[in-house]
Amino acid sequence: MIVGVVDYTVGNIGSVLTALKRAGAVPVVVKGVEEAGRVDAVVLPGVGTYEAAYALARQFKEVVLEKPTLAICLGMQLLFESSEEGGGQGLGVFKGRVERIKARKVPNIGWRYTHVVKNSEIIAEGYYYYLHSYGVRWGENEAYTAYIKLEEKYVAAVERGHIIGVQFHPERSGRTGLELIKRFLAVAKR
């Protein structure tokens, strides 16, 4: 399976490419919509600033709506309606607003337990690696699949159809993260 990793040109996507390869995919870097049209699935990685990433990601909205998509950290945040960071608009795939997190330490860095609240073929409960200063507050929403508890609850994963977003970094989450990527690939092949 060929998986296109969107390159926002503002961060390192090497660990995502390596994790996809370890999970059995053939990862390729995509910088344009035309290139993305030739892949089987898409990854919106979690690197860069919201403003810079959104400028490129909005070109990929139709691709995200059509192809299996895994959005990681910043990639997941781009799927929401808006963000406090950079005062930016989001892609509006999911309802919600990205805000600066309330936690004892910001950014939230490290392994945190992720609580799953609805059945998912892809998201499993357990410890994942987080690195973020912004997030979406937990609330009632059928797409919200998992949460992380800091000073408040924040969305850890969203899911609707073929679109999956995770606030954590599966590519840095050891075996647990690799298994999540494998499950994403298995579902994407259907």
From Swiss-Prot:
EC number per UniProt: 4.3.2.10, 3.5.1.2
Keyword terms, alphabetized: Amino-acid biosynthesis, Cytoplasm, Glutamine amidotransferase, Histidine biosynthesis, Hydrolase, Lyase
Compartmental location: Cytoplasm
One record GO biological process: L-histidine biosynthetic process
Catalytic reaction list: 5-[(5-phospho-1-deoxy-D-ribulos-1-ylimino)methylamino]-1-(5-phospho-beta-D-ribosyl)imidazole-4-carboxamide + L-glutamine = D-erythro-1-(imidazol-4-yl)glycerol 3-phosphate + 5-amino-1-(5-phospho-beta-D-ribosyl)imidazole-4-carboxamide + L-glutamate + H(+); L-glutamine + H2O = L-glutamate + NH4(+)
Domain Glutamine amidotransferase type-1: 2-190
Cellular-component GO terms for this entry: cytoplasm
Stored InterPro entries: Class_I_gatase-like (IPR029062), GATASE (IPR017926), Imidazole-glycPsynth_HisH (IPR010139)
Keyword Metal-binding (UniProt): no
Active site (UniProt): C73 (nucleophile), H169, E171
Any Pfam family hit: GATase
A single MF term (Gene Ontology): lyase activity
Pathway where this protein functions: Amino-acid biosynthesis; L-histidine biosynthesis; L-histidine from 5-phospho-alpha-D-ribose 1-diphosphate: step 5/9
PANTHER family cross-referenced by the UniProt entry: IMIDAZOLE GLYCEROL PHOSPHATE SYNTHASE SUBUNIT HISH
Function: IGPS catalyzes the conversion of PRFAR and glutamine to IGP, AICAR and glutamate. The HisH subunit catalyzes the hydrolysis of glutamine to glutamate and ammonia as part of the synthesis of IGP and AICAR. The resulting ammonia molecule is channeled to the active site of HisF.
Assembly: Heterodimer of HisH and HisF.
Protein name as annotated: Imidazole glycerol phosphate synthase subunit HisH
Higher taxonomy: Archaea, Thermoproteota, Thermoprotei, Thermoproteales, Thermoproteaceae
